[in-house]
Amino acid sequence: MITLNTEEKIFIYSWLKNILSHELTEQQLQQYQQGVFTPLFDFLSEQDLAEQINTVRNSLMQLSNLPLAHLELAADFAQLFLLNGENSALPYASAYLSEKELNQHIAFIDHLLLKYQLKFDHSLREPSDHLAVYLELLITLEKSGQKEKSFNFIQHYLLAWLIPFNKKVQKIKTETSFYQAITEILITLLNKT
């Protein structure tokens, strides 16, 4: 059973947002391979995520045997999230929702961004239907202590498109299963917390 307090949720959602927003740098990958994240992995394994964490660990071990590991992981990221919608699992709600649903999502997301005065780095050029924006809003709702709003946001806005997104991620073959395991962790946490 997954039991997380608010601080743990915020930390884990932030970690997932960072991993799923952009490719890991060579330095970040080295931190993973050097065990900097071992305490987090151990904690998540205790939260009924052992299978997914084992996949992450095995992927990191597999990468440690490659001379340009960070480039291989970047290629996995690109193949999974950056190609066209036929070949990638695009991390945008617009790739999975009907036009009507998307318009409702965008209106609500934009309302929350304004309400919580959240601004994003415009150099990233991510529209408000990007996964990172949704996760940042979830983190903000968690920080505000609004458990019911967080739950409703997860149920009605995140899972509405993340379940088909994750199904597509799982079907795409890459050198490692690192990102497939990460998206499984996200879906499992959202479904069980």
From Swiss-Prot:
Keywords: Chaperone, Cytoplasm. PANTHER family: CHAPERONE PROTEIN TORD, CHAPERONE PROTEIN YCDY. Coiled coil: none annotated. Involved in the biogenesis of TorA. Acts on TorA before the insertion of the molybdenum cofactor and, as a result, probably favors a conformation of the apoenzyme that is competent for acquiring the cofactor. InterPro entries: Chaperone_TorD, DMSO/NO3_reduct_chaperone, HscB_C_sf, TorD-like_sf, TorD/DmsD_chaperones. Its main location: cytoplasm. Pfam families: Nitrate_red_del. Disulfide bonds: none annotated. Belongs to the TorD/DmsD family. TorD subfamily. This is Chaperone protein TorD. GO terms for cellular component: cytoplasm. It is found in: Cytoplasm. GO terms for biological process: protein complex oligomerization; protein folding.
